[in-house]
Swiss-Prot record:
PANTHER family: ANKYRIN REPEAT DOMAIN-CONTAINING PROTEIN 27 (PTHR24170), DOMAIN PROTEIN, PUTATIVE (AFU_ORTHOLOGUE AFUA_1G09870)-RELATED (PTHR24170:SF1). GO terms for biological process: early endosome to late endosome transport. Coiled coil: none annotated. One of its GO terms (molecular function) is guanyl-nucleotide exchange factor activity. Residues 289-436 form the VPS9 domain. One of its GO terms (cellular component) is late endosome. It holds the Pfam family VPS9. Belongs to the UPF0507 family. This is UPF0507 protein SCY_4172. It comes from Saccharomyces cerevisiae (strain YJM789) (Baker's yeast).
Length: 1090
């Protein structure tokens, strides 16, 4: 047999094991011989590691080690019967080819390399693939499982030298050979060493304990006694600095100070709070302080200079600073207090990094002067909103309990402490001025009254004396809500209209556009969130009448802290959607990656869901056309990989009409849209999508190897998806699916074409019944080209209550084979069409069939005498068909391998370009790096759907061809040569008989006797005995020839019939159901990619 080479696979390990053209000459020939009849799992590291890294110890590239048996053995997991048991409740243990132990946690997709590995690693399963066997030297399975893992195991590896041209090459996993960066703060290290020394020297601890007691005894109960604290710290320092135990500490005084502070903080703090009791700043009376009251300079600006946007930015910083200052109450040291204070001021002034939402905002404060007075005013609001109860105590602590007194006088900390001191003085001066207090009390009371009237708990919806509140209408609460926003959220629409109409100059359109809460919600977003549609319509009417299109687009697409626009909050507000839909940016995504259209599709609780979905889709489509583009389905995929098809509850035909649509797309959990519909029983969607020719019905979820049938719990759902399975089957007659176990008894759902009222029927049949049916058919058709014995044996092994990925793969393969098998049987009319109505019908047909078979006369009673001419004719007929079948079998073998490699090389092409793009972006040369961004590839020469269908049909046809070829081979090369052998012996016996007894017409009977002379009688007896022996041999040979001839004749007749059936099946299968279907499907799918 000539040697031909298949294309090299990208992954060196997969290529070395499965793609060897001459295994008998390979350095791995012993490994191949060991694995020849065994099933195994291959662990395969990513190609990028095997191609671009080398082993630290041997200095050899990893792709060279892939041809080393010792290296490969650790990646091959041998399978036993336990490999099929589901291990959801326990780990699954495997043994490698060289005896090492590997544990797989299937549920978590994790592999642990344990006993035998010199480096124990935790590996992540990146992907699970089923590799159809295409070589001729592995006979243990038709398919092999490959688990792609995140890194190599059992070796230390580093990048090859040529990767140095890439900067920041960080593809080395955490377990790879690399020097760790363990930089530790020296002061923290000294502190740890200092405390350790104290703990192992109790005498020192006792001395320090005495000093702690001295402070508690000497310091008065209402005086923190800074001098006493500093005295005992200095005393401890003097006693320890000369001790050899502490001579190596460069910051000994600071360490002692911090240690004393840690142990005496509670005592100091209790004295401080007692000392300032009755004199602390009471922020309760200032709870209604607002930005407009403290930043009067901003509000007094000219109309052209004042921007409400600046105020909203200030509000956000106030909120961040207030939240941070609240942590001051949780501090227990000078360092912690100073850190909180400085960070609070930084957040307030905007000098530190804000959250992601604020980073997207323009810094309006850059155009404003943040002088000391402004900062103090803002800090006053921060203190009020943080509700600090011991402000003076914190200030005193910061001023007196530092280990370095100069730190509170200079630098950023000094500025922060002086600002806090100024705020405390502000409150003290404010309280001393009776006029200020009276004014503040009046303002506070007025604000409280107005807010009470605007409260949702207040039934009134109007304010008769609105003019009395004119001076506080610019009030904004701590959430950044204006009076307008409060009216909207509390549904005070009459008051809202009064304010907008009577105080139009105080609330110009420009301010309405810039009015936002601290979380970025505009007035329109607030109205939609509160369900106040009346207020929303008022606002929209004002905007449409007064704003330009550019202003409308900008306003409607403003985002809150979740990156949501007003459109993301629309669920059932049809009128509002129609009025602002043309201004919505339909591609804008929120923080979850959801577009407005996606959010509307996900809003399942709206009463007019289908109408809302249809309207939103039409408006979005119009928006795309307005921007000179077609609707792009890929724009609307969220951060979890869910597409619009995944989330749409009903009415999916509006999406199925799109041309560039992948209806089999998986989300990040591996779920296709069909799986989601089946899981949540969305029958209308199931009905629509199963009619689409692009659907891959049995798409497999990578992490679990579930198909849509595994998510189906309802008979109506199983029937619906089963109907699509029938249509996709070989001849569109029957489909096996959904194998289940009940007390170790396996059952399967069978959907078949029905002659009843409904075109399809789905029934549940026991697999033992199917097995019995196959045995009955095999008895009627012993020379069938269908490999029924194989299916019967495989059904016998279905005794596992639960299955892992390995078992699921076998079950899926068996169900596919049974589907093909019974499609052929129905196509050839070997069984009746209505056989699968129910299980009773199958059992009844089997009994009737057995009875008919028993009534047939046996062919052995009247053996057929075959002449050499007839044998020659049969031999010529069978030889011709055998040659044709052998040639066709060889062609199928090549076609199967080509189809497998088209898919494998397509995946290799994609992986190679992904790796190239990733490496290209890391090139040190920026110009060269940017060139990789423009690489566009189209590796899909053929559609996944058409390839999978064609490969399955070719594999099945090849199995049938091999089965038929084996029968022909037995008759042609065993039975017929045996007949010719016996025929030659028969002729030789006749020749011997005629030579010995030339005058005998036929052999005498043994009963013929006559009286003879004694001597003559003796001679005659010997002659007769010899003649009788030859006669018996001739008779036995003649009987054997008749039996062999009869057997050949019957086999020939049945084989002739089976060859006819095979030719009919082959033509229909290959031409109509395979090649034509492949071309049609592939053309239609690829047209959508053009």
């Amino acid at each position: 047999m000539s040697v031909y080479h298949l294309p090299t696979l990208l992954n060196p390990l997969v290529n070395a094991i499965f793609n060897c053209p001459e295994p008998e000459r390979s350095p791995l020939k012993k490994l191949f011989a060991n694995l020849k009849t065994r099933r195994f799992i291959l662990l395969a590291p990513p190609s990028e590691y095997l191609l671009n890294y080398h082993d630290v110890k041997s200095k050899l590239p990893l792709h060279d080690l892939c041809y080393n048996a010792e290296f490969i053995n650790s990646y091959i997991l041998l399978m036993t019967e336990n490999s099929y048991i589901n291990t959801n409740s326990r780990d699954s243990h495997y043994e490698t080819l060289d005896g090492k132990t590997v544990v797989i946690q299937w549920k978590n997709n994790v592999i642990h390399a344990l006993n035998g590995f010199h480096i124990r690693r935790r590996l992540k399963i990146l992907e699970t693939k089923i590799l159809p066997n295409f070589n001729d030297y592995f006979e243990g399975a038709a398919d092999f499982i490959i688990l792609f893992i995140d890194q190599p195991l059992n070796c230390e590896f580093v990048p090859n030298d040529y990767l140095q041209c890439f900067h920041n090459y960080e593809k080395i996993p955490k377990n790879a050979h690399a020097m760790p960066n363990l930089s530790i703060d020296s002061f923290q290290q000294e502190r740890s060493s200092f405390e350790n020394i104290l703990h192992i020297h109790p005498a020192r601890l006792t001395q320090l304990g005495q000093l702690f007691s001295s402070y508690r005894t000497l310091a008065p109960g209402d005086d923190p006694s800074r001098s006493i604290f500093e005295s005992i710290v200095q005393q401890a320092f003097d006693g320890m600095k000369s001790d050899s135990l502490f001579k190596n500490f460069s910051n000994l005084y600071d360490l002692i100070h911090d240690y004393f502070e840690l142990n005496l903080y509670d005592d100091i703090w209790s004295r401080l709070t007692t000392h300032f009791k009755g004199h602390e700043v009471d922020t309760e009376k200032y709870k209604y302080f607002s930005v407009n009251q403290l930043l009067t300079d901003f509000y007094s600006k000219d109309y052209g200079e004042f921007k409400l946007h600046d105020i909203t930015l200030i509000e956000r910083r106030l909120h961040l600073a207030s939240k941070h200052l609240q942590k001051l109450a949780l501090t227990h040291s000078y360092a912690e207090k100073s850190k909180i204070l400085v960070e609070t001021l930084q957040k307030l002034s905007g000098t530190t990094e804000m959250d992601s939402h604020q980073l997207e905002l323009p810094d309006g404060l850059n155009n404003m002067t943040m002088d000391a007075d402004t900062l103090i005013s803002l800090f006053v609001l921060v203190v009020c909103r943080s509700e600090q109860k011991h402000l003076k105590s914190h200030l005193y602590y910061l001023q007196n309990f530092s280990n370095n007194s100069s730190s509170t006088k200079f630098g950023i900390l000094g500025y922060a402490v002086s600002t806090l001191e100024a705020v405390v003085c502000y409150f003290e001066d404010f309280n001393k001025n009776t006029g200020n207090v009276a004014k503040a009390n009046t303002l506070c009371e007025k604000t409280k009254n107005l807010l009470d009237k605007l409260s949702c708990e207040n039934p009134t919806n109007e304010i008769e004396d609105l003019a009395t509140y004119k001076d506080i209408l610019t009030y904004r609460n701590e959430q950044g809500q204006s009076i307008l926003s409060i009216c909207i959220t509390n549904h005070k629409n009459y008051i809202l209209l009064d304010i907008l109409s009577e105080y139009e100059n105080d609330f110009p359109v420009e301010d309405l556009l810039e009015d936002e809460t601290i979380d970025g919600s505009t007035l329109l977003i607030e109205s939609i969130k509160a369900g106040n549609l009346e207020a929303a319509k008022v606002l929209i009417k004002i905007m449409l009448f007064n704003c330009t299109e550019e202003e409308l687009v900008s306003y409607i697409n403003k985002t809150d802290k979740y990156a949501r626009t007003v459109a993301h909050y629309l669920t059932h507000e049809m009128d509002i959607l129609k009025s602002i839909g043309n201004y919505i940016d339909w591609k804008r995504k929120n923080s979850s990656g959801q577009t407005p259209l996606f959010s509307i599709f996900r809003s399942y609780d709206q009463p007019n869901y289908e109408e809302m979905v249809k309207t939103a889709f039409d408006i979005a489509n119009t928006w795309y056309r307005k921007h000179n583009s077609l609707f792009d389905y890929l724009d609307h995929t969220d951060n979890k990989g869910n597409s619009l098809l995944h989330v749409l509850k009903t009415n999916i035909p509006i999406l199925l009409q799109l041309t560039k649509l992948d209806i089999n797309e998986e989300n990040y959990k591996g779920l296709t849209p069909l799986m989601v519909y089946v899981k949540y029983k969305r029958l209308s969607n199931i009905d629509a999508i199963t009619k689409d020719h692009r659907l891959i019905l049995e798409k497999v979820q990578n992490s679990t190897f579930f198909t849509c049938f595994d998510y189906a719990k309802d008979h109506s759902v199983l029937s619906k998806i089963g109907e699509r399975g029938v249509k996709d089957s070989l001849f569109g007659l029957i489909y096996f699916h959904s194998l289940r176990y009940h007390n170790l008894n396996a059952t399967t759902n069978i959907t078949s074409v029905s002659n009843a009222e409904k075109p399809f029927a789905t029934t549940v049949i026991n697999m033992k019944t199917i097995q019995g049916l196959l045995r009955s058919i095999l008895k009627d058709n012993p020379f069938t080209f269908l490999p029924l014995n194989t299916y019967i044996d495989e059904i016998s092994h279905l005794n596992r209550s639960d299955l892992t990925i390995i078992g699921k793969t076998d079950v899926t393969s068996l169900l596919h084979q049974l589907t093909n098998c019974f499609n052929v049987l129905l196509f050839l009319k070997k069984i009746p069409e209505n056989l699968f109505t129910d299980e009773a019908s199958i059992l009844y047909w089997m009994r009737i069939n057995t009875s008919k078979r028993n009534q047939k006369p046996s062919g052995k009673e009247n053996p057929k005498t075959m002449e050499p001419e007839e044998i020659n004719m049969i031999q010529s007929f069978l030889r011709f068909n055998f040659d044709e079948i052998s040639s066709f079998k060889a062609s199928l073998n090549i076609l199967r391998k080509v189809l497998i490699f088209i898919n494998l090389k397509s995946d290799d092409f994609e992986d190679a370009y992904k790796g190239l793009n990733e490496m290209g972006r890391k090139l040190i040369n920026s110009e060269a790096s940017s060139a990789f961004k423009g690489i566009i590839t189209n590796h899909n020469m053929f559609s996944e759907l058409s390839l999978a269908e064609l490969l399955e049909n070719v594999r099945f046809l090849e199995q049938c061809t091999i089965q038929l070829s084996s029968f022909v081979q037995i008759i042609l090369f065993e039975k017929i040569p045996n007949w010719w052998k016996h025929y030659g012996e028969f002729l030789a016996l006749h020749k011997s008989y005629r030579k010995a007894f030339p005058n005998m017409v036929k052999p005498k009977s043994a009963s013929d006797t006559s009286s003879r002379a004694p001597l003559g009688g003796f001679i005659e007896t010997k002659r007769e005995q010899s003649e009788q022996r030859l006669a018996v041999q001739i008779k036995a040979s003649s009987k054997m020839l008749k039996e062999l001839g009869s057997e050949i004749f019957v086999a020939h007749e049945r084989l002739a019939e089976e060859l006819s059936n095979y030719m009919e099946f082959r033509k229909a299968c290959l031409d109509q159901r395979s090649l034509v279907a492949f071309a049609t499907t592939n053309i239609s799918v690829l047209q959508e990619c053009v």
